[in-house]
Amino acid sequence: MNRRNLLASATGIAAVGAATQSSTAQEAAMTKHEFKLKYAPHFGTFSPVASKSLSDELNYAHDRGFTAWEDNRFLLRTPEEQKEIAETMEKLDMSMGVFVVTGSAGATEPTFTVQNDDAWNLVLEDIKKGIEGAKRCNATWMTVVPGAYDLKSDWNYQTANCIELLKRCSDLLEPHGLVMVLEPLNQHANHPTMFLRESPQAYQICKAVDSPACKILFDVYHQQITEGNLIPNIEASWSEIAYFQAGDNPGRKEPGTGEINYRNVFKYIHDRAKAEDLDFIIGMEHGNSMKGPEGCEAVIQAYVDADNFEVS
């Protein structure tokens, strides 16, 4: 073979190799995974690869194997956006996770923890709006953050006040079969002023409210920071948990980027839920560790890896 033919042959082989690699990468990027749990992304998770519309991102998530979704901002969206989300999710047979109904994670003024008729009436109005919003998107769960603690009041009085207001909220929700999930937020990295911080505290409050409409949102990221001991705390508060969220620590990115053994955590949730015929959504309330399409693929792979546990 002369030099010219040799070079041509080498170039052709390289081109075929590059084309094969490109084809393999494209096939990997379109793989639809079969997850054991209902992991729920949110708008923004896949926007680098599906940014044309809200429905575009929902369709992409569905095509990659995700069967649930959550949208904290649902009640703040326009009626047109809410309709688009609801219709697309119904068409794709995706389950709606949480949206935020009341409470600000950045609040500094107490609401639930003080006896204040004006503040409490605003909370109850928020709950009523949440009921209507849930009807529009076929949701069951809505996030409630009980706000800031009161520096001037004993913690036990604040707990009693919080329980009283939650009972009133529950009275509104119960006839509709809806559930507010209380989210404890960590005070060390993100929310130093929040009253509700730990899962045992949330468990105590939910037991006192004693309503199917008042349960716990166990955010693994927050609870790793506030108390750790994750699986034993999930086990201890299990009867009051209605919803989970994920995010690794430190950094609050996808599983595998921090210190939490998500494969074991997810296995515990899956196996116990299956044994008790329960069905949980795991909200992916975290950012992407990398930008662009590569970051989207890294998030998906993180859940593929964390979901790769043996079923008991």
Range-by-range predicted roles:
Residues E84-K91, R168-L172, N233, V265-Y268:
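Catalytic-core regions built around general acid/base machinery
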Residues N2-G65, N138, L196-F218, H222-S312:
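Histidine-acidic metal/acid-base catalytic patches
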